[in-house]
Amino acid sequence: VLDQVSDGLPERIQLKLDEVRKGLPSLFQAGYPTALQHDDFLENNFHVNEATGHITGVVDWAAAIIAPFGVSLGALEVIIGIQTASCWHFHPNHIELREHFWDTFYQEAGQISAADRRSIEVARLFGLFRTHGFEERDARVMYLEALSML
């Protein structure tokens, strides 16, 4: 998948893709979990309680996968941004929202080693490249640059 995605990408994105390639073995080491993942976690596939902001349901599990943990965590970027035909626009507070997500995630997950945190980031980036790496030429570069260079 990554070899197919890499064709024609600018060097700055190739460097990020190389980081993912180097980290992929960590996703398949003994002890690193696989998990059922939604794999299409877009804003129209989850229900939120408007009063509390809590997720109350997730729908459309047809594309669910079992994969190394974290492959679908790139969906966070889709939730705090919007894709148009010519650009990726992030919510004005996307930095704070992203920090809050990861702070909460790691607090709720409990003890996670530094190595597993790196593996989660590799999995997240792999998911972003897999999901957005097959867009049309110009859109592909724009989306990958916006989403993977954070």
Task: Label each PLM-derived region with a short phrase.
Residues 44-73:
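Catalytic activation segment of kinase domains across protein kinase-like and atypical kinase folds
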